[in-house]
Regions:
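Gly/Pro-rich turn-and-neighbor structural signature
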Residues: 1-3, 28-162, 268, 275-276, ...
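Aromatic-lined substrate-binding rim segments of carbohydrate-active enzymes
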Residues: 1-16, 224
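Short helix/loop capping segments that flank catalytic or ligand/cofactor-binding pockets
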Residues: 18-19, 69, 118-119, 140-143, ...
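Active-site clefts of carbohydrate-active enzymes
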Residues: 20-22, 65-71, 161-189
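Conserved, mostly hydrophobic/aromatic
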Residues: 131, 199, 211, 243
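Catalytic-core region of carbohydrate-active enzymes that cleave or remodel glycosidic bonds
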Residues: 182-210, 224-229
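Aromatic/acidic polysaccharide-binding cleft in carbohydrate-active enzymes
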Residues: 209-234, 284
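C-terminal non-catalytic alpha-helical accessory regions
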Residues: 237-291
Length: 291
C-alpha cells in the first residue's frame, strides 16, 4: 500500500501499527502494569518498521481483542485511574513518534469507553492530536449499540472547539446484529449527506477515515462521502443521478437512481430511530443465533 502511494494508518486496537501484546507474548497476561517495557518495545518496533512511510499515527490504548484494557487489569477501577493511564500512554506514544519525525501527524479514536472518558474530563491529549469521533455503524454520529444497550451518546465535538477533530465513518459495518457489511447501507443518501454536513458544522474536518470494506457494494455511498468531503454540502438526489450516469451510462440513469433510492426506503426498520434499518447481517446472523 505504501509503495502505491497510499498513506498508512492503524486500527484503534493496534496503536502505532505495533504487534498485539497477546500475539507477541501469548503466555503472558496482557497487562501494562506488569510489563511496561515489553509494551514500549512493541510500540518502538512498530514505529521503526514504518519510519520511511507516509503515516497518520494512531495512538491510544485498548485491551487485547479490541475491548477496554481494564478487562485484563482490574486494578484500574475508576474513571480517574483509567483516564490517567490512557492519557499518560498516549503522551508517551506521541513523544516516541515525534522523536522520529517532529512533523508527524497523530490521531486517536474517541470510541466506546474512551469517548466517555474524554467527555467526562478524564482523558487529556496533546493539543495537535486529531480526535476521531465515530458513527454507530449505521451512519449516525452517536455511540454504537452494544448488544441491547444503545445509549446513543452524541459523538461530535462541541460547537466552537477549535482543536483538531475528524471522524471514523462506516460505509460498511460488521456487528453480527443488523449491520450492512456485504450490501449497501440501508439508510438513505440524503440521511448520510445531512449527517456529514453536521459533522462539518461541528468542525470535524481535519481527517475522515472511512471503513469501505470490499468497496464494490458501497461504491455509490463512497462517492457521496467523497463529494461531501470535497464540497461540504451535496444534493443527494443529484449525486445519485450523476453516479448512475457515470457507473451505468446515460440511458437508464434516472430509473436506476430511483431503484437505489427505493432500496433504503424499503429497508426493514428494527427500532424507533431514523437510522434503525437492518442490513444483510440481520438476515444472515440473527437466524443462526435463533437456530
Amino acid at each position: 500500500a505504501a509503495d502505491m502511494g497510499l498513506i498508512i494508518t492503524h486500527h484503534h486496537a493496534e496503536p502505532l501499527g505495533a504487534e498485539m501484546f497477546a500475539q507477541a507474548y501469548p503466555d503472558l497476561e496482557p497487562m501494562y502494569s506488569k510489563y511496561p517495557e515489553k509494551f514500549r518495545a512493541l510500540w518502538q518496533a512498530g514505529i521503526d518498521a514504518q519510519k520511511d512511510m507516509r503515516v497518520v499515527w494512531n495512538i491510544g490504548f485498548r485491551g487485547q481483542g479490541d475491548r477496554p484494557f481494564w478487562d485484563d487489569d482490574p486494578q484500574y477501577d475508576t474513571p480517574e485511574k483509567r483516564g490517567a493511564l490512557i492519557s499518560s500512554l498516549i503522551k508517551e506514544q506521541y513523544d516516541l513518534v515525534r522523536a522520529n519525525d517532529p512533523e508527524a501527524v497523530c490521531c486517536t479514536n474517541l470510541y466506546g469507553e474512551t469517548m466517555e472518558l474524554y467527555k467526562d474530563g478524564f482523558l487529556h491529549l496533546p493539543e495537535d492530536v486529531i480526535k476521531i469521533w465515530a458513527d454507530n455503524g449505521f451512519g449516525k454520529m452517536v455511540s454504537r449499540r452494544q448488544e441491547n444497550n444503545n445509549p446513543r451518546v452524541p459523538a461530535l465535538p462541541a460547537f466552537g472547539d477549535t482543536s483538531a477533530h475528524g471522524i471514523y465513518y462506516h460505509a460498511s459495518f460488521y456487528d453480527l446484529q443488523a449491520a450492512s457489511h456485504i450490501t449497501a447501507l440501508s439508510n438513505s443518501a440524503a440521511f448520510v449527506a445531512q449527517e456529514l454536513a453536521d459533522v462539518l458544522a461541528h468542525g470535524a474536518d481535519d481527517y475522515w477515515l472511512v471503513n469501505c470494506s470490499n468497496v464494490k457494494p458501497h461504491a455509490m455511498l463512497l462517492d457521496l462521502i467523497a463529494r461531501c468531503w470535497r464540497d461540504g454540502t451535496v444534493d443527494a438526489g443529484q449525486q445519485c443521478i450523476a453516479y448512475t450516469a457515470a457507473y451505468y451510462g446515460l440511458l437508464h440513469r434516472c430509473e436506476i437512481a430511483q431503484c437505489l433510492a427505493d432500496y433504503a426506503q424499503f429497508a426493514v426498520p428494527y427500532g424507533p430511530h431514523e437510522d434503525d434499518h437492518a442490513g444483510d447481517q440481520f438476515y444472515n446472523h440473527v437466524p443462526r443465533m435463533l437456530i
